[in-house]
Amino acid sequence: MTTLRLESLKANKGARRRKLRKGRGIAAGQGASCGFGMRGQKSRSGRPTRPGFEGGQMPLYRRVPKLKHFPLVNPKHFTVLNVSALNSLKDGSTVNLDSLVKDGVVTSPKHPLKILGNGDLTAKKLTVQAAAFTASARTKIEAAGGSCETLD
C-alpha cells in the first residue's frame, strides 16, 4: 500500500465532470438555444433580470406598504397591578411582590412589579415597594397617606 502524499492524491472516478460547452452545435446537446428556450428576455445575452423584477409590473416589494414601527429589541416586562387591587390589603402594611404573592393578589411573579393608577385607593397608609410606578398611581398612594419606594 502506498503512503498518502500530496502528489499521489487523485479524485474518485466520476467525481470530476467536464465543463458543459454551450452553443457549440446540436450534437453536443446544448447547441443552438443552449438550454435557454426559444425567445424572450431570459434567452438573450447579458445579465438576466434582477431579483424581484416582474416584467415592468409594479413589484411586490414596492406594492406592500412600508413598516412604520419596529418593536423594541429588549423590552422591559412588568407584573402589573392597579391601585384598586391594593384595597384588599391591611392598613399600614408593606406591599411588595413577595407579600402580594403570599396574600394571593398576584399569582405569577415572573417579572418586577409595576403599579398602575386605575381605580381608587381608600384611605390606607401603605408602604408600596415596586420597580416602577405610573404618575397617577404615585399620587393616589401618597394622597391616601402611603409612601412609594422604587426598587432597582
From Swiss-Prot:
Function per UniProt: Binds to the 23S rRNA.
Transmembrane domains' residue ranges: none
GO biological process: translation
Protein name in UniProt: Large ribosomal subunit protein uL15
Gene3D superfamilies with a match to the protein in the record: 3.100.10.10
Disordered as annotated region, ranges: 31-58
GO MF terms held by the record: rRNA binding; structural constituent of ribosome
Top-level taxon of origin: Bacteria
Subunit structure: Part of the 50S ribosomal subunit.
InterPro entries tied to this protein: Ribosomal_uL15 (IPR030878), Ribosomal_uL15/eL18 (IPR021131), Ribosomal_uL15/eL18_sf (IPR036227), Ribosomal_uL15_bac-type (IPR005749), Ribosomal_uL15_CS (IPR001196)
Matching SUPFAM superfamilies: Ribosomal proteins L15p and L18e
Family, per entry: Belongs to the universal ribosomal protein uL15 family.
UniProt source species: Parasynechococcus marenigrum (strain WH8102)
Keywords, comma-separated and alphabetical: Ribonucleoprotein, Ribosomal protein, RNA-binding, rRNA-binding
Keyword Ribosomal protein set for record: yes
CC annotations in GO: cytosolic large ribosomal subunit
